Amino acid sequence: MNVGTRFFVSLVAALAALTANPQSPPPSALINQESEETVEAARSASPHTSESTYAYFREEAETFLAEATQRIWDPDAPREPSPRTAWGDPDLSGYWLNVAYVPLERPVELAEKPLYSEEEAITAFVRWATQDASVDPATVHYDWTEFGMDNWQSPVRPNLRTSLIVDPPNGRVPPLTPEGLVRLEQQARRHTLESRGLYERCIQGNQGPPRVPFLQNTGQSQIFQTPEAVILITQSNSDVRILHLDSSPHAPQSVRSWLGDSRARWEGDTLVVATTNFHHGRKWDGSAGDLHLEERLTRVARDTLLYEATMTDPTTWETPWSVEVPWPMMDPPGLFEFACHEQNYGIINVLRGARVRAAEYEAAQREASGTE
């Protein structure tokens, strides 16, 4: 019995034990200590019946893990030659998914271990995927599960890497500069509409740039090409990036945008994208308008793009740092409409809560300094 089969068998046993009794409460009820009445009310609002909920969870999760554990992402594996467009450029076109069950930063206890063994990679993958899939689809939720868009329903597969960060060698975000630390603390104090995040305000999606996987599975994107440009569309907020290939210079520093100003070129089979001129109001991990981003996209297999990104901002981090994320091809392909502003009345309560927290923080600071 190979490694993948052995872990899959143990997983099936765990899932079967969890879902064998249709009278027992669903996992979310156990986690959240919800009442039986609340769970039943949630089920009645779902297209799944009580019985089909358990079958749905068990059968789809088992199928997903059976398929996923047959292919493991190995960064050192040989790469396939890239297919070509009609005009001879590497063909990156298609629908791709930016998703991973790998942490951005390497756990401290794995600081000297950049790669898992296959057995360890499958163990980590099964742990994260099982936890993700254990959210009962009969409870009230967004439409991710109904439309097959949760991470555990995607073509994501185990990864030998122990972190998405590949440089520095310890797999951790470099220390912030004093200026970056102050900026990050200021960004955390969000008590006005303009200081809230762009994603929260429906101005920009959660897919960067840079394209670091987000908690929600909104990493769906489409790439199409012309001889003059590569166009990248993300489902999240319907963001569009036009990556010009004409060797023109970047826009003047006074011209800035939320997605930055990008210029692209081909290096062999790899598309290299340099992006500068980010809007100073854009906030990303403490960085703002001084971020210089280099992204690299390579089609390493028929159904896989390799995304690499290096972030440089001397005003924020002590050194540059880089991530690597394999993008599986979406199956089935296609993007959904991303409606955001239409139901964003919750921002009022968010702002109210932020102002209360800010007032409490300022009062505590005054008390600590003896000025109150």
Predicted stretch roles:
Residues 9-19:
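Bacterial N-terminal signal peptides
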Residues 21-372:
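PEST-like low-complexity, intrinsically disordered acidic/proline/serine-rich tracts
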